[in-house]
Design a protein with these regions (language model features):
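Aromatic/hydrophobic pocket-lining residues that form the small-molecule binding cavity
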Residues: 24, 50, 103
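Hydrophobic faces of well-ordered beta-strands that scaffold small-molecule active sites
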Residues: 8-12, 39-43, 65-67
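Alpha/beta enzyme core
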Residues: 1-37, 54-60
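Conserved, mostly hydrophobic/aromatic
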Residues: 10, 61, 84, 177
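A mid-to-C-terminal "edge-of-domain" accessory segment
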Residues: 92-223
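Glycine-rich phosphate-binding active-site loops on the catalytic face of alpha/beta enzymes
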Residues: 12, 60-77
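C-terminal helical cap(s) of enzyme catalytic domains, especially alpha/beta-barrels
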Residues: 73-99
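Active-site beta-loop-alpha junctions enriched in small/polar residues
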Residues: 13-17, 42-48, 70
Length: 223
């Protein structure tokens, strides 16, 4: 094939998604050394390593990465395009021209077309990526997010958010009161609000909506 093709590039394909990053690096170097041709890498995510193996391939000299937006693809999906983009840009210092703030719009459109929802905790795209429930260091969420997060929320068109739930503390309640324009509260009221917030969070096994918190505030103030 090399002699009679001849190919423009060589694709290394991990169809079953079972190659380790170390194995992929070895294969890229070996094939590149043997052929002298550009290398393309195509992986699947059966072991959750699709992005890791493609990043490893790039460090070994691969010039082309195959990916799918939202990590879609057969079975467990292909390497997630948005994760590769941010990884190459932020972790490996590649100078790219990508408009990262457009990723949420693209992801939402594709999710609707494919009828596959985006998990709240999905890297890069998840709605919960920049949420802080614990009361520890919540001031950084809004004012210095890189203290708390691996990427700045604004890079991908998002913002930090404080939510209330079973792990919240008084500081979170105070912050939420201010954010929603609900004024201040006495210490005993704060303690009661926090108790009720935790009760609701435990009961629903999720964080509270602003409407649920408003109901708690009104109930506590009403006595």
């Amino acid at each position: 094939v090399l002699n009679e093709g001849p190919p423009d590039s060589i694709g290394i394909v991990d169809t079953m998604g079972c190659a380790t990053p170390e194995a992929i690096k070895y294969m890229v170097r070996w094939v590149k050394g043997m052929t002298g041709l550009p290398i393309e890498i195509h992986t699947h995510n059966d072991f959750g390593m699709g992005v890791a193996t493609e990043l490893a391939a790039v460090t070994a000299g691969a010039e082309v990465v195959h990916s799918c937006a939202n990590g879609l693809g057969e079975r467990t999906g292909n390497a997630a395009m948005e994760e590769l983009m941010l990884g190459l840009h932020l972790l490996y210092g590649y100078d790219t021209n990508y408009k990262f703030d457009k990723l949420p719009e693209l992801a939402a459109m594709l999710s609707a077309i494919a009828n596959i929802p985006i998990a709240r905790n999905k890297p890069v795209l998840g709605s919960g990526n920049f949420i802080r429930e614990s009361g520890i260091a919540i001031q950084y969420v809004m004012h210095d997010p890189l203290v708390m997060f691996g990427t700045h929320p604004a890079l991908t068109g998002k913002s930090g958010e404080v939510m209330l739930g079973k792990k919240s503390g008084k500081a979170s309640v105070v912050y939420k009161l201010g954010e929603l324009g609900l004024g201040e509260a006495e210490d005993d009221q704060l303690a009661e609000m926090l108790t009720r917030v935790k009760q609701v969070g435990i009961a629903k096994r999720d964080m509270l909506s602003d409407a649920e918190f408003r109901e708690i505030v009104d109930a506590v103030r009403a006595g």
